[in-house]
């Protein structure tokens, strides 16, 4: 069996170290830096010939820098004769650009990134909760898209929620909400239906479901600016919700996210470490971060040993 080696870029070094600790191995020795003009510089400082190499790197902000680090690291490994290269991308950036809207003259950037990674020589991709599962089909190599839900569910169950109801923040998240509700004992769900009655009129947050006097659990795959999430929480509290918790795998937290969440009626926001939490977000006092290290370490072990990934969720 080829020697397994883990390497990390600069995007999520803490998560990479936690994964290495779980696997009882050290992170590989690589220097990922910048030339004076800003170009990415990579030097692999140990022998990887014939090794089963895993490169851990989310393509979160700064998205283009982190993507280029990953691409250049893959090329360096390929030229150093690595036996197999797996890109471990907990958060896959550009995933929201997965389609053309009608006849709009826009790119499908998720496909561009998939081609970029495939063409540079990656053999396999491991990611978590892709924004759109069909992105797996953009790649010409195998993609394992695993679920972060078990990590979030563990926290939900430990909170002793009172008469809980799972809430989808929009119509597109109903399938996720139903799956979460089933895992929590087939509890009720509610849906926040955001719509604009007519042009130049503020959006109205319509609520479908009973939340009065109950703990609400909003579930989503990611939180960006948090604007819609905070409005959904307000709508729930206005309808008598007791407490409102928000759960998401990916803590994108861009723009005014820190301000929005700090000033919101949300009781707690629970996310994972697929993206490193900024000091500004941590200072809000409302964000709890859970680690994906155990799940990712097990997935990496299974890939290296040619074992089933889907069996992790049976």
Curated annotation (Swiss-Prot):
This enzyme's EC code(s): 2.7.6.1
Catalytic residues (positions): 194
Binding site for Mg(2+) 1: 131
Matches recorded under SUPFAM superfamilies: PRTase-like
Binding-site residues for Mg(2+) 2, renumbered to this chain: 170
One GO term of the biological process aspect: purine nucleotide biosynthetic process
Compartment list: Cytoplasm
Gene Ontology MF, one: ATP binding
Binding annotation for ATP: 37-39, 96-97
InterPro entries: PRib_PP_synth_CS (IPR000842), Pribosyltran_N (IPR029099), PRibTrfase_dom (IPR000836), PRTase-like (IPR029057), Rib-P_diPkinase (IPR005946), Rib-P_diPkinase_bac (IPR037515)
Pathway: Metabolic intermediate biosynthesis; 5-phospho-alpha-D-ribose 1-diphosphate biosynthesis; 5-phospho-alpha-D-ribose 1-diphosphate from D-ribose 5-phosphate (route I): step 1/1
Keywords, ordered alphabetically: ATP-binding, Cytoplasm, Kinase, Magnesium, Metal-binding, Nucleotide biosynthesis, Nucleotide-binding, Transferase
Keyword Signal applies: no
Alphabetized Pfam families for the sequence: Pribosyl_synth, Pribosyltran_N
Catalytic reaction list: D-ribose 5-phosphate + ATP = 5-phospho-alpha-D-ribose 1-diphosphate + AMP + H(+)
Binding site for D-ribose 5-phosphate: 196, 220, 224-228
Family: Belongs to the ribose-phosphate pyrophosphokinase family. Class I subfamily.
Role description: Involved in the biosynthesis of the central metabolite phospho-alpha-D-ribosyl-1-pyrophosphate (PRPP) via the transfer of pyrophosphoryl group from ATP to 1-hydroxyl of ribose-5-phosphate (Rib-5-P).
PANTHER family: RIBOSE-PHOSPHATE DIPHOSPHOKINASE FAMILY MEMBER, RIBOSE-PHOSPHATE PYROPHOSPHOKINASE 1, CHLOROPLASTIC
Protein name, as recorded: Ribose-phosphate pyrophosphokinase
Organism phylogeny: Bacteria, Pseudomonadati, Pseudomonadota, Gammaproteobacteria, Vibrionales
Gene from which this protein is expressed: prs
């Amino acid at each position: 069996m080829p020697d397994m080696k883990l390497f990390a870029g600069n995007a999520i070094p803490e998560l990479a170290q936690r994964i290495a600790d779980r696997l009882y191995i050290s992170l590989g020795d690589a220097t990922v830096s910048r030339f004076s003009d800003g170009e990415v510089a990579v030097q692999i400082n140990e022998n990887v010939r014939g090794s089963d190499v895993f490169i851990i790197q989310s393509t979160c902000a700064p998205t283009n820098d982190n993507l280029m680090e990953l691409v250049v690291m893959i090329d360096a490994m390929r030229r150093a004769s690595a036996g197999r290269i797996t890109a471990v991308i907990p958060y896959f950036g550009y995933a929201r650009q997965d389609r053309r809207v009608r006849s709009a003259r826009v790119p499908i950037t998720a496909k561009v990134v998939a081609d970029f990674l495939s063409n540079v020589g990656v053999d396999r991709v491991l990611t978590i909760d892709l924004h759109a599962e069909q992105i797996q089909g953009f790649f010409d190599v195998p993609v394992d898209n695993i679920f972060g839900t078990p990590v979030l569910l563990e926290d939900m169950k430990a909170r002793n929620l009172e008469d809980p109801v799972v809430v989808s923040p929009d119509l597109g998240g109903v399938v996720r909400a139903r799956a979460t509700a089933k895992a929590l004992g087939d509890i009720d769900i509610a849906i926040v239906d955001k719509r604009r009655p007519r042009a130049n009129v503020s959006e109205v947050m319509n609520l479908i479901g009973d939340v009065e006097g109950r703990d609400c659990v909003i579930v989503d795959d990611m939180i960006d600016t948090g604007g819609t999430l905070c409005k959904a929480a307000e709508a729930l509290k206005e309808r008598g919700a007791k407490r409102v918790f928000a759960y998401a795998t990916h803590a994108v937290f861009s723009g005014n996210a820190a301000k929005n969440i700090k000033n919101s009626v949300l009781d707690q926001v629970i996310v994972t470490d697929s993206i490193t939490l900024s000091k500004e977000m941590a200072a809000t006092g409302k964000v709890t971060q859970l680690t994906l290290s155990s799940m990712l370490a097990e997935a990496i072990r299974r890939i290296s040993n040619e074992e089933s990934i889907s069996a992790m969720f049976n």
